[in-house]
C-alpha cells in the first residue's frame, strides 16, 4: 500500500469528500492520559484543524497492553481530568467505550465496535511517528487498516516510513510527557504550564501522584 503524505490539497480533498457523502470525519486520540497534558491537546486540536475534521475524540484506555498497570491511577480520576481539560474547548470530546468495556484495550476491537455503532462516520486514528514504526506488531493490523485511516504526527523534516496507509501531519515537537509530570509532583515541583491549570488543581486537590 502506498504511503500517503499530507499535502496542501489533503484538507481540501477531505472536505470535498465530506460534502459529497455527508459522512462525518472524526479523529481519535487514544492514550492513558495519566495525566492529560498540553501536548495531547495541541496534537488533537492541530490535527482537527489541519485535516478539517468535524471533531477529535480523546479516548482513555482501560488496560493498554503496553502500559504498566502499577503506574496507572483509577480511571475515574483520568476521566475527570479529561473532562476538566476540554471544558469550553471547541471540537474536542471524550469517548469512553474502552473504559466501559474493561479488559485490555486493543485498537482493533475498539474500532470494530465504533464503526458498527457509527456507520456514517469515517474515523482517523491519531498516533505519533514513533508508533508508526510499530504498526506491523499491532493486534490484527491488516484488518484494522480497513476500519480506520491512520494519521501520523511528526515533527517538521522528520521522515518516517511505513508500508501502511498513513496521512502525515507535521507539528513542532512539544517535549511534555505524563511521566515527566508525575515525576515533578513526586519531587515536590509544580508542573506549571505543562497541563491545564484546572487539571493541576484537581491533581493537587485529590493528592494524586504523591
From Swiss-Prot:
UniProt pathway annotation: Cofactor biosynthesis; NAD(+) biosynthesis; deamido-NAD(+) from nicotinate D-ribonucleotide: step 1/1
Enzyme class: transferase
Keyword Hydrolase: no
The entry's keywords: ATP-binding, NAD, Nucleotide-binding, Nucleotidyltransferase, Pyridine nucleotide biosynthesis, Transferase
Swiss-Prot/TrEMBL GO biological process terms: NAD biosynthetic process
Listed transmembrane segments: none
Statement: the UniProt record of this protein carries the keyword ATP-binding: yes
InterPro entries: Cyt_trans-like, NadD/NMNAT, Rossmann-like_a/b/a_fold
Single GO term (MF): nicotinate-nucleotide adenylyltransferase activity
Family annotation (PANTHER family): NICOTINATE-NUCLEOTIDE ADENYLYLTRANSFERASE-RELATED (PTHR39321), PHOSPHOPANTETHEINE ADENYLYLTRANSFERASE (PTHR39321:SF3)
Protein name per its UniProtKB record: Probable nicotinate-nucleotide adenylyltransferase
The species this protein was found in: Streptococcus pyogenes serotype M1
Amino acid at each position: 500500500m502506498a504511503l500517503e503524505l499530507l499535502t496542501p490539497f489533503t484538507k481540501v480533498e477531505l472536505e470535498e469528500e465530506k460534502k459529497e457523502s455527508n459522512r462525518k470525519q472524526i479523529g481519535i486520540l487514544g492514550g492513558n492520559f495519566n495525566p492529560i497534558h498540553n501536548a495531547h491537546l495541541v496534537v488533537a486540536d492541530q490535527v482537527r484543524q489541519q485535516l478539517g475534521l468535524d471533531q477529535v475524540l480523546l479516548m482513555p484506555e482501560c488496560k493498554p497492553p503496553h502500559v504498566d498497570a502499577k503506574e496507572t491511577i483509577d480511571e475515574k480520576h483520568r476521566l475527570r481530568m479529561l473532562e476538566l481539560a476540554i471544558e469550553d474547548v471547541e471540537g474536542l470530546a471524550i469517548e469512553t467505550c474502552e473504559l466501559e468495556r474493561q479488559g485490555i484495550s486493543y485498537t482493533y476491537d475498539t474500532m470494530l465496535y465504533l464503526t458498527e455503532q457509527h456507520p456514517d462516520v469515517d474515523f482517523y486514528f491519531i498516533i505519533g511517528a514513533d508508533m508508526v514504526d510499530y504498526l506491523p506488531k499491532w493486534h490484527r493490523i491488516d484488518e484494522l487498516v480497513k476500519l480506520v485511516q491512520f494519521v501520523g504526527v511528526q515533527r517538521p523534516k522528520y521522515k518516517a516510513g511505513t508500508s501502511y496507509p498513513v496521512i502525515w501531519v507535521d507539528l513542532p515537537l512539544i517535549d511534555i510527557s505524563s511521566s515527566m509530570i508525575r515525576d515533578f509532583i513526586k519531587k515536590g515541583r509544580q508542573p506549571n504550564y505543562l497541563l491545564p491549570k484546572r487539571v493541576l488543581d484537581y491533581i493537587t486537590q485529590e493528592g494524586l501522584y504523591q
